A protein has these predicted regions:
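Zn2+-dependent metallopeptidase catalytic core
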Residues: 1-14
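Substrate-binding/catalytic groove segments of enzymes
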Residues: 69-82, 113-123
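Non-catalytic architectural context of zinc metalloproteases
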Residues: 19-25, 58, 87-93
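Long, well-structured alpha-helical subdomains associated
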Residues: 94-98, 108-137
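Active-site scaffold of zinc-dependent metalloenzymes
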Residues: 22-55, 71-72
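Active-site recognition of the HExxH zinc-binding catalytic motif
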Residues: 59-72, 104
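Post-HEXXH active-site segment of zinc metalloproteases
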Residues: 55, 71-102
Length: 137
């Protein structure tokens, strides 16, 4: 999934991505992304809850990869402990209302469809998504 996403949406970037599977019950989430540096980040760790259904796992990974893309392209930034999205301070906005989260939740669904469609075309998938619309990220 990660290789598919990077090849499709960030092919010219040299990135290091570690994926860690562990219990995130105490963190009250299914996954999160950490960058080792906030200045032109290229090294990332994606932490994923180790006990998820396959569909939740895939969508959560895609959600975090959207955030990775936001960081790499510079639309998501951290300055002085504050989160900025497209130049706007979003730190005081509730989590589910933050614009970068809204984008990631929307795109995780679209990417899930696109990923499965691409896997079907390559003979690796198990779903039939031929009739679903195309989209661009």
């Amino acid at each position: 999934i990660t290789t598919w996403f990077i090849n499709k949406y960030l092919p010219r970037h040299k990135l290091t991505i570690d994926i860690v599977h562990r219990s995130l019950l105490k963190d009250d989430c299914y996954g999160f992304l950490d960058a080792t540096s906030y200045s032109r980040p290229r090294d990332f760790t994606i932490s994923l809850h180790s006990k998820m259904k396959e569909i939740d796992y895939v969508k959560t990974l895609l959600h975090e990869l959207v955030h990775l893309k936001q960081w790499v392209e510079g639309s998501l930034k951290m300055k002085s402990g504050r989160t900025y999205y497209k130049g706007k301070n979003v730190s005081d906005i509730k989590y589910y209302e933050q614009p970068h989260e809204l984008e990631a939740f929307k795109l995780q669904e679209e990417l899930y469809i696109q990923y499965n469609r691409d896997m079907c075309k390559s003979g690796k998938g198990k779903y039939n998504f031929k009739k679903l619309p195309q989209f661009t990220l």
